[in-house]
Curated annotation (Swiss-Prot):
Lineage of the organism: Bacteria, Bacillati, Bacillota, Clostridia, Halanaerobiales
An annotated Gene Ontology molecular function: proton-transporting ATP synthase activity, rotational mechanism
InterPro entries (UniProt xref): ATP-synt_VA_C, ATPase_a/bsu_AS, ATPase_F1/V1/A1_a/bsu_N, ATPase_F1/V1/A1_a/bsu_N_sf, ATPase_F1/V1/A1_a/bsu_nucl-bd, P-loop_NTPase, V-ATPase_su_B/beta
Name this polypeptide is given: V-type ATP synthase beta chain
Organism: Halothermothrix orenii (strain H 168 / OCM 544 / DSM 9562)
Keyword Transport: yes
Stored NCBIfam families: PRK04196.1
Amino acid sequence: MLTKEYRGVASINGPLVVVDGVTDVGFDEMVEVITPDKHKRRGRVLQVSKNRAVIQVFEGTSGLATETTRVKFLRHPMEIALSRDILGRVFNGVGEPIDGGGEVYSNKKYNINGNAINPYSRQYPRNYIQTGVSAIDGLITLIRGQKLPIFSGNGLPHNQLAAQIARQARLGDDNEDFAVVFVAMGIKHDDANFFINSFEKSGVLQNVVVFLNLADDPAVERIIAPRIGLTAAEYLAFEEGMHILVIMTDMTNYCEALRELSSRREEVPSRKGYPGYLYSDLASLYERAGMIKGERGSITQLPILTMPNDDITHPVPDLTGYITEGQIVLKRDLYQRGVYPPINILPSLSRLMKDGIGEGFTREDHPNVSSQLYAAYSRVQEVKSLASVIGEDELSSLDQTYLKFGRVFEKRFLSQGREENRTIEQTLDLAWEVLSELPPTELDRISGEELEKYYRGSVNDNG
């Protein structure tokens, strides 16, 4: 395929280069930017308007001159070579190996932009992915093919939780091929080292593909990294027949990079300076999760984002919530009280949970136990509000029982060690131990048969 080369550029602004007088140039086309000293830098076409092309340069524009810089259009979008050999490898944000293991060789390259799965071709998500974290497995169950974000805040242990899930995640059926694609955007070097060391020491790295975009890497790579990670996931899922969990952190850094580029392009800003197309851009990533009829594999997404000032109405968590199928919310107050992971279950939910738990999936009592835990913990918050007005000593004995239940629930069920991996059976058994702090008359969401079988106290106890 013939390439076109142009000498001289119209303007340079941050990571963007504008070239005038171009013909037959396509959106997302890859570009070689040749510096005056003959070094090559990569770029891609961001915008085409009549005979003008706007190009984002991956390695930045430092040292470029408008008159002597040459631009070569390569006539193809950004692509990545993929094979099953990517498992166990570590790449940078543009898909280059950084683990010393050499290039990945393949007869075929894949367009990183991919496509959202056709709704008609989608298969409804079923079955669950066990994370080993009781709060998630028991109350906000992650379903195969789902997209379930984690809403965190600065200083909360979302990195530790992400690494723990990546280490512990498995399917209910061990006979299925399962792997994790881990994409990090704009993270610090010590966080990157933490993730790699965590995967290596636990022995799971051989079943993980890692893409790392560091805080001092070009911002434009932050926009590319999740697309490369999802392309790798699509290859493993739909060509190799594997079930893939994609963990992406931190989506707020991704959106900040998008805002920076939008500002450079002098686009009209929307809420808090983010581009007006933020919703559709996020959807182009999140909608690449799912299952396809007739295909064996699946892609499940667990995007993680930090909410500025813990504001859940901020555009990034707000728009993410519209696209995804629930959310897991971390709470600063729980973390300050020593609860790890500090998951606030009341605003958290998994919209697909009901279709992947219960008899035939987890255990027959799971739906009712989950519902009862939510109801009881909600009552705990009401009792705490009352106690703050009249004092604990003035509470009824039943209300004091609920306060005790709340303390036990947070200490024994929500809290667990960072290396502790609980099976779904252990999680449900622990849920019954906690619920048994309440008299059976208060467990109105659980059937009599389940009470007889699992309740740890006396079923005849009326409190």
